[in-house]
């Protein structure tokens, strides 16, 4: 499938300046300043003066990092170049999460595959410790040849997952019908590269080929426009936190979901024989 670049349509939704008293921006962030390596020893490396980070996985261990700061609402962008070649069995996770048994979490997970087969991007949203809201997509480009931008926009109304500024998923605030929404717990940014060959590729049928190790993923151009620590829901009229998708972005979202979605928990009647989750019963097409 040919890669198509759509960088302009969605960006206009997020250009309004953030309130200086409660917001912070990190443009082209420095990995030394913004993140800590949390595990993996020498398998996680920061170089190019803090502008590039790599995570590696070998048979002994994977590796990971997390942000120094916590955030509540905002837009997070990171460019990744995923594990090349036979990446079957590996998972590169990039997500936001709070801590504790009732944690909130917003997930991108990239499931490796055999050479020539497409990567799968696995998304999930946890609220108050409960997940089971998976949607999965094939990527419509080779994510190992070049860097691509993976973004989360999180505001009191919705969570938007984007790839190269194209929305692939929207999780709307459905508190009005009793569905918890992540809005009170600040989250850190995490990423890790690890072995998950018990489930990641074809349900665990394809195992990691350790003769191809080490497996390496690369990160650059971290950018955050977020609340740090605490933030109110009132951002002022016209602020980006209250924006909705425009018509072009809705078309792009429908295009992705029609052509590349391979799993949607909101249509899995076998998994939920007693009824789909409440948010799936709403008429919105963009859950």
UniProtKB/Swiss-Prot annotation:
Xyloglucan binds at residues 109, 122-124, 132-134, 198-199, 203, 271. Glycans are attached at residue 113. Residues 1-28 form the signal peptide. It comes from the Eukaryota. The active site is at 105 (nucleophile), 109 (proton donor). Expressed in fruit pulp. Expressed in leaves, flowers, calyces, stems and fruits. Highest expression in leaves and lowest in fruits. Optimum pH is between 5-5.5. Loses activity rapidly when pH is lowered from 5 to 4. GO terms for biological process: cell wall biogenesis; cell wall organization; fruit ripening; xyloglucan metabolic process. SUPFAM superfamilies: Concanavalin A-like lectins/glucanases (SSF49899). Induction: In fruits, expression is decreased by gibberellic acid (GA3) or 1-methylcyclopropene (1-MCP) at the beginning of storage (until day 6). Expression in harvested fruits is increased by low (0 degrees Celsius) temperature treatment, particularly at the end of storage (day 32). GO terms for molecular function: hydrolase activity, hydrolyzing O-glycosyl compounds; xyloglucan:xyloglucosyl transferase activity. It catalyses: breaks a beta-(1->4) bond in the backbone of a xyloglucan and transfers the xyloglucanyl segment on to O-4 of the non-reducing terminal glucose residue of an acceptor, which can be a xyloglucan or an oligosaccharide of xyloglucan. Contains at least one intrachain disulfide bond essential for its enzymatic activity. The record marks 107 as: Important for catalytic activity. GO terms for cellular component: apoplast. Transmembrane segments: none annotated. Keywords: Apoplast, Cell wall, Cell wall biogenesis/degradation, Disulfide bond, Fruit ripening, Glycoprotein, Glycosidase, Glycosyltransferase, Hydrolase, Secreted, Signal, Transferase. The keyword Oxidoreductase does not apply. Pfam families: Glyco_hydro_16, XET_C. Residues 29-219 form the GH16 domain. The keyword Magnesium does not apply. Belongs to the glycosyl hydrolase 16 family. XTH group 2 subfamily. This is Xyloglucan endotransglucosylase protein 1. It comes from Diospyros kaki (Kaki persimmon).
């Amino acid at each position: 499938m040919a890669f198509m670049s759509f960088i302009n349509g969605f960006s206009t939704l997020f250009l309004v300046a953030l309130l200086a008293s409660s917001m912070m921006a990190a443009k082209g962030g420095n990995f030394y300043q913004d993140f800590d390596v949390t595990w993996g020893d020498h398998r996680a490396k920061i170089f190019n003066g803090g502008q590039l980070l790599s995570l590696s996985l070998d048979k002994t261990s994977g590796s990971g990092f997390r942000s120094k700061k916590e955030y509540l609402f905002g837009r997070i962008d990171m460019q990744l170049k995923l594990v090349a070649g036979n990446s079957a069995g590996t998972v590169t996770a990039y997500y936001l999460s709070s801590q504790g048994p009732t944690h909130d979490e917003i997930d991108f997970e990239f499931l490796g595959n055999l050479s020539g087969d497409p990567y799968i991007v696995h998304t999930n949203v946890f609220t108050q410790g409960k997940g089971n809201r998976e949607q999965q997509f094939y990527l419509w480009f080779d994510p190992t040849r070049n860097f691509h931008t993976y973004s989360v926009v999180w505001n009191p109304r919705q969570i938007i997952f984007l790839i190269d500024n194209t929305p692939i998923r929207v999780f709307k605030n459905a508190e009005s019908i009793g569905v918890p929404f992540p809005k009170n717990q600040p989250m850190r940014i995490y990423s890790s590269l690890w072995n998950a060959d018990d489930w990641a590729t074809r349900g665990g049928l394809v195992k990691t080929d350790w003769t191809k190790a080490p497996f390496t993923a690369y990160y650059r151009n971290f950018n955050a426009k977020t609340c740090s620590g605490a933030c109110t829901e009132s951002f002022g009229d016209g602020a980006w936190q209250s924006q909705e998708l425009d018509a072009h972005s809705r078309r792009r979202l429908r295009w992705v979901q029609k052509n590349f979605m391979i799993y949607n928990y909101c249509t899995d009647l076998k998994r939920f024989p007693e009824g789909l989750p409440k948010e799936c019963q709403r008429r919105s097409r963009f859950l």
